[in-house]
Amino acid sequence: MSFQIRVFTAILAVLSLFTAPVLAQNSGPLRIEITEGVIEPLPFALPVFEAETADAADVAAQITQVIAADLTGTGLFRQIEPDAFISTVSSFAAPIQYADWKAINAQALITGAVAVQGNQLNVKFRLYDVFSGAEMGDGLQFSATPDGWRRMAHKVADAVYSRITGEGGYFDSRVVYVSETGTKDARQKRLAIMDYDGANVKYLTDSSSIVLAPRFSPDGQRILYTSYETGFPRIYVLDVTSLQRRGLESQEGTMSFAPRFAPDGQTIVFSLSQGGNTDIYRMNVNGGSATRLTSAPSIETAPSYSPDGTQIVFESDRSGSQQLYVMPANGGEARRISFGPGRYGTPVWSPRGDLVAFTKQNAGRFHIGVMRLDGSEERLLTASFLDEGPTWSPNGRVIMFSRETQGAQGRATLYSVDITGRNLRPVRTPEGGSDPSWSPLQR
């Protein structure tokens, strides 16, 4: 059984929400073991990438550190400390002494080299299966300007993750969120964007008005969000590169909010309140008339498309309490999918199409959870004073959300967790953070 198949089988088992804990069924030594629901991370060796030019030493070390952080941050990989190395990789082209790496129980070995040539940074890497004594696939090379070194590191980590698990990675992605300062009764909010790991934070709006619910377009180039700058909620479209923005058409006396793109990138759905009623509407992102999709005498909000664009999941209190429903993308009969105790909200469809993530309030606690599209196999992943606003990683294996602490200060912090409820981790931001939206992989 190949390295990829052995490891991927085990990873799928630990990441599967719907299988009992198992032990990876293979006799080979290269595997991730799962015993009684506990994962044994894959040990890997990562020597500092070789500097092929004199001015590349510092950036080579930085790239190596980011790759290690990406992989270990998943909870699926464990880095072997360099002090344990028996031999070093003298150059990128040098033959690999597999016995030395096997002796320290490394199951994977990652080597690489970095060169700076004028205004171009070149990064190349190779991945080796230590126990079979073979390279996994061909080496890859990425190029960018020197200030793009973090993206190059994320691209290498994505490639390693993909080759070992057989699934796409999520490291070369970004997150837009609401940056928050001040106390609860005087909170200032502005849009911010960052790398998935909290690096390279940039602010997209000022704090002169409240902003809510930023949502990426499918290509990651535009952001929908709600702003109160006119005194009532209105939806805006922001270009990520130019920072140019425009407000969507709105009628006097209406409030529009909770926007989200359809998979085609041209259609949006949102909630619109008028005449005491709140329903879900659809319109072209470039403007035009809006089509009403729901008409129940209740509050209908937080719509999210299925990956194929044929269905919409949303929240509604039409049954008397806040619950989740699925309807055709063109409107029509909706079916309820949440039936547990408590209230459900902020549903978002997994990019894999198999699950819906949601916020649940029950017995004085808030949870982030997932369920299947028929409402079965609900699992709560977190619990705290206030967890809300889930968003999916590009590969559908990790969820980011915001958590607010109790008290007058009530600082909101971003967290991530995998779909089994393991590997709960804070995402560091300069200020408080809420309402995240995860981009697709960058191009």
From Swiss-Prot:
Belongs to the TolB family. It is found in: Periplasm. The lineage of its organism: Bacteria, Pseudomonadati, Pseudomonadota, Alphaproteobacteria, Rhodobacterales. This is Tol-Pal system protein TolB. Residues 424-443 are annotated as: Disordered. HAMAP family: TolB (MF_00671). Keywords: Cell cycle, Cell division, Periplasm, Signal. Transmembrane segments: none annotated. The keyword S-adenosyl-L-methionine does not apply. GO terms for cellular component: periplasmic space. Residues 1-24 form the signal peptide. The gene is tolB. SUPFAM superfamilies: TolB, N-terminal domain, Tricorn protease N-terminal domain.
